[in-house]
């Protein structure tokens, strides 16, 4: 997911996307703890997507949108 794509979404869509990613990250963390993690590369992708969403949300809050 690119930051430019995220900037086109409104705040509600960003919050929804963030919540989905956080849930997926939690599920992956549980799988890793149980030793059943199939795709460890997914961790870094999710973490970076979460950071991108939070960055866009912070940009908007600083700009006063």
Curated annotation (Swiss-Prot):
InterPro entries from the UniProt entry: Ribosomal_protein_uL29, Ribosomal_uL29, Ribosomal_uL29_sf
Alphabetical keyword list: Ribonucleoprotein, Ribosomal protein
Tagged with keyword Ribosomal protein: yes
CC annotations in GO: cytosolic large ribosomal subunit
SS bond partners: none
GO BP: any one term: translation
GO molecular function: structural constituent of ribosome
SUPFAM superfamilies from the UniProt entry: Ribosomal protein L29 (L29p)
Family membership noted in the UniProt record: Belongs to the universal ribosomal protein uL29 family.
The name this protein goes by in its record: Large ribosomal subunit protein uL29
Name of the gene encoding the protein in the UniProt record: rpmC
């Amino acid at each position: 997911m690119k930051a430019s794509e995220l900037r086109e979404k409104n705040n509600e869509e960003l919050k929804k996307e963030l919540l989905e990613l956080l849930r997926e990250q939690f599920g992956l963390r549980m799988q890793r703890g149980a030793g059943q993690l199939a795709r460890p590369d997914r961790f870094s992708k999710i973490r970076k997507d979460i950071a991108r969403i939070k960055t866009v949300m912070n940009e908007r809050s600083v700009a006063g949108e």
